[in-house]
A protein has these predicted regions:
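Conserved nucleic-acid-binding Ia/Ib motif block in the N-terminal RecA-like helicase ATPase lobe
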Residues: 58-111, 171
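SF2 helicase catalytic motif II
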Residues: 106-109, 116-157
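Motif I (Walker A/P-loop) of helicase-class P-loop NTPases
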Residues: 42-51, 139-144
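Conserved interdomain linker/interface between the two RecA-like ATPase lobes of SF2 helicase motors
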Residues: 148, 155-157, 162-174, 178-266, ...
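Conserved segment of the helicase C-terminal RecA-like domain
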Residues: 351, 355-365, 370-411
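Non-catalytic terminal extensions of ATP-dependent helicases
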Residues: 313, 318, 332-336, 424-753
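Conserved C-terminal RecA-like helicase domain
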Residues: 61-63, 71, 78-88, 253, ...
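Conserved pre-motif I regulatory segment
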Residues: 1-35
Length: 753
């Protein structure tokens, strides 16, 4: 609630009601969860916390889901409070780690809580930006672990996009932390969004009009529609032509890197959005950034530079970081009118525009094409509408009538955004750190504190309540049918059936389960016989209606029994813990619930820790040369892109492959699936880079995008840093690892902050 004592302005901005409310709770030293639409100013609350704690002489941690957002925040606060006060930790970058303001990825914060909690023991506040990432299938567990292991003396600020189950998330955190969590929500956007579809013959239109036109062509094959010009494909050029006067700047989300580039190049053939003065500014900014890279060579750069001089650009993860920096800087200065980008551009980074366009409502998720979710849609659409500039933001989605399927479009209603779901997972590293720091009963308690278990218990209560209600209804109809059907046999059969189903739910012996299922089938046959019996003294219409109701109730009850049986994640996590613990014992990482030397090393490695530890224990990191070691570290966990060609090399990796096959076999035996990955597709390039070759010469042989190669090298640097930190007591290896890092972290691969 707002009162007269609330802070109403900050950094010259008049705070919105939700910002005032959040700041008021922070001033009372309370934890706050803010859920509000993308682009309404949640970040201003984070800035207030950071500045407040710093001015009071305390320490504060800001965590982000992606390194680009961490880097952006580091630059902002370095400029605001001075570089001595701000540090950054992102795995591959470490600057001023003891600073009072620490910017880091959420993974680093989780790792510090598990391995060296004393390093963050004096932190007063931690900020979880984009906390809805708890729902991310690959990384969501990191947010859960951070919240579980965070000391309850530490306060937190969670910033989330709009989520329907924010109360459930806050209640779970209260439950595990033992501290109150204040919820602040905002549903209205300062700059409202207008959503529409676009089809070249209809123009900017509605779903209703699209459906009406599509009905005319129902049943006609696509090739006929196109060959006879019944339907003309709608392109990005059609949409840009429609919005170029009055709707720019525009972010054009395209779920393909190749299409990002080809669309931008195609637009550049027809349009130039900049005047002479703007072109001069573009040239000045480009020169300022490229001065840091005198030998910058990229196949993309000449054509991208020509596009930038026209106010057109593209942005995706396959680009060199310096090229992305140039595009971002120009967009910030309002010198880009149309930017084709992939969805990563929408994560956290503050780049508002007037209009957001989608070239499709479906995306490839690594397995298949699927419709984008409402949350994904609004994460991107929320960039439309610039505060203080636009009265409304516009969101347009291209429709191809020859492919049209209304079920593949998000609802475009913010109130229908999907709820968060837990993605909790147990890694070998987490298990080793749990065993290292907690007693057995505390470990089992912690395993029950995850968000998945909390959500399951909540659903379980609802399921059991509904089962009780249905059971009462079943007994009522059972009594009715029993009176009409004759003896008491019907009611007895029902009671017996429910007893067996409850027993079946808790039975694990396969033979007993088969017998119980056979008993249920026998009872079902007898019940059906009674239900189908024609009774001349009974009104047959009423009896048929009651039988139908009874069958529906019984079917629903049986579905609920199955669902209730699925809702026991605590047992699932305990079993997963025991299976992985048994594997760690078999590998010699644990003895009598104590970590061995191998276990200690694995507890400090995050990702592919079994492969790394086994290699270390066999002396491989000591034996390989610096270039070979870099090639190997880049290969550990490397995931080649589809159809990527492996570049041949002469490094003997037979020992590593032997270990990898051994670990894969052990994982299949103990947990039923492998996790270790080793792919040497770019090992040769890492070897040559370490020996001093230029990045341009590597790209002549590279079978992947230049940005992907930089990412692979930086992942290798991250692993090398972890190994360096874990082997401080081995000065020879430690020195070699430092040399490895120095030779990898140079020129185009370095990050400038």
């Amino acid at each position: 609630m707002i009162n007269q004592h609330m802070v109403r302005t900050y950094r010259g901005f008049t705070l919105d009601p939700f910002q005032q409310e959040a700041v008021a709770y922070i001033d009372k030293n309370q934890s706050v969860l803010v859920a509000a639409p993308t682009g309404v100013g949640k970040t201003l609350v984070a800035d207030y916390v950071i500045e407040k704690i710093y001015n009071e002489g305390g320490r504060v941690v800001y965590t982000a889901p992606i390194k680009a957002l961490s880097n952006q925040k580091f630059k902002e606060f370095k400029a605001h409070v001075g570089e001595e006060a701000v540090g950054i930790l992102t795995g591959d970058v470490v600057i001023n780690p003891d600073a009072p303001i620490l910017i880091m990825t959420t993974e680093i914060f989780r790792n510090m809580l598990q391995e060296s909690p004393e390093r963050v023991g004096d932190v007063r506040y931690v900020i979880f930006d984009e906390i809805h990432y708890i729902d991310d299938p690959q990384r969501g567990s990191v947010w859960e672990e951070s919240l579980i292991f965070m000391p309850n003396t530490m306060r937190f600020l969670g910033l989330s996009a709009t989520i329907p189950n924010v109360d459930q998330l806050a209640n779970w955190i209260e439950d595990i932390q033992g501290q109150a969590v204040q919820i602040v929500t905002a549903s209205e956007r300062v700059v409202p969004l207008r959503h529409a579809l676009f089809e070249q013959s209809l123009g900017i239109t509605t779903m209703g009009r699209i459906k009406k036109k599509h009905r005319r062509y129902r049943g006609i094959p696509r090739h006929v529609l196109l060959s006879e010009d019944l339907v003309k494909p709608t392109t990005h050029l059609d949409l840009i032509d429609k919005i170029k006067d009055g709707y720019l700047p525009c972010l054009f989300f395209t779920f393909s890197r190749r299409k990002c580039e080809s669309n931008a190049l195609e637009l550049g053939e027809y349009h130039d959005f900049l005047n002479g003065e703007q072109k001069r500014q573009v040239k000045e900014i480009i020169e300022k950034i490229t001065d840091r890279y005198p030998d910058l060579k990229s196949e993309r750069w000449p054509s991208l530079r020509r596009l930038l001089m026209k106010g057109i650009a593209y942005h995706h993860a396959g680009m060199l970081p310096v090229l992305k920096d140039i595009v971002e800087e120009l967009f910030t200065h309002r010198l880009i009118s149309v930017l084709y980008c992939t969805e990563t551009f929408a994560v956290g980074l503050n780049f508002p525009c007037k209009t957001v366009c989608f070239d499709s409502s479906t995306k490839w998720d690594g397995v298949s094409f699927r419709p984008i979710s409402n949350r994904e849609y609004f994460q991107m659409a929320g960039r439309a509408g610039r505060r203080g500039i636009d009265t409304e933001g516009f969101v347009f989605t291209i429709v191809d009538l020859s492919y049209f399927d209304p079920s593949e479009f998000p609802s475009m209603k913010e109130q229908e955004i999907e709820p968060l779901q837990s993605q909790f997972a147990l890694t070998y590293n987490s298990i080793l750190n749990l065993i290292k720091n907690y007693e057995e009963e505390d470990i089992y308690r912690i395993l029950g504190q995850n968000f998945a278990t909390y959500q399951a218990f909540a659903e379980q209560e609802a399921v059991l309540t509904e089962m009780e209600m249905i059971q009462e209804e079943l007994e009522k109809y059972s009594a009715h049918l029993q009176k009409k059907s004759g003896p008491d046999i019907f009611g007895k059969l029902i009671r017996r059936k429910l007893q067996i189903e409850a027993q079946l739910h808790n039975e694990y012996n396969k033979r007993t389960k088969r017998r119980l299922k056979k008993d249920i089938r026998g009872i079902n046959r007898r019940l059906e016989g009674i239900l189908h019996k024609n009774l001349p003294h009974v009104d047959q219409r009423t009896l048929r209606r009651e039988r139908r109701i009874y069958r529906r109730l019984l079917a629903r009850y049986e579905r609920l029994i199955v669902r209730e049986g699925e809702l026991d994640p605590h047992e699932k996590y305990i079993q997963e813990f025991l299976d992985k613990k048994a594997l760690l014992e078999a590998l010699g990482y644990l003895e009598d619930d104590e970590l061995t030397a191998a276990g200690e090393l694995a507890s400090q490695i995050h990702g592919h820790e079994l492969l790394v530890t086994e290699m270390f224990m066999e002396g491989m990191f000591h034996d390989y040369s610096v270039p070979e070691l870099n090639a190997i570290c880049v290969s550990i966990g490397y995931e080649p892109r589809k159809n990527e060609i492996r570049i041949k090399h002469k490094i003997d990796m037979s020992g590593i492959l032997r270990i990898w096959h051994f670990i894969t076999k052990m994982e299949q035996r103990f947990i039923g699936y492998p996790t270790a990955q080793f792919n040497d597709h770019v090992a040769a390039l890492a070897y040559r880079w370490t020996n001093g070759e230029s990045f341009a010469s590597l790209l002549e042989d590279a079978a992947i995008d230049e940005g992907d190669l930089v990412f692979a090298f930086r992942r290798g640097i991250d692993l090398l840093r972890q190994l360096r930190n874990a082997t401080i007591e081995d000065p020879v290896l430690n020195g070699k690892l430092r040399e490895c890092i120095a030779k990898m972290d140079r020129d185009e691969v370095s990050i400038w902050l």
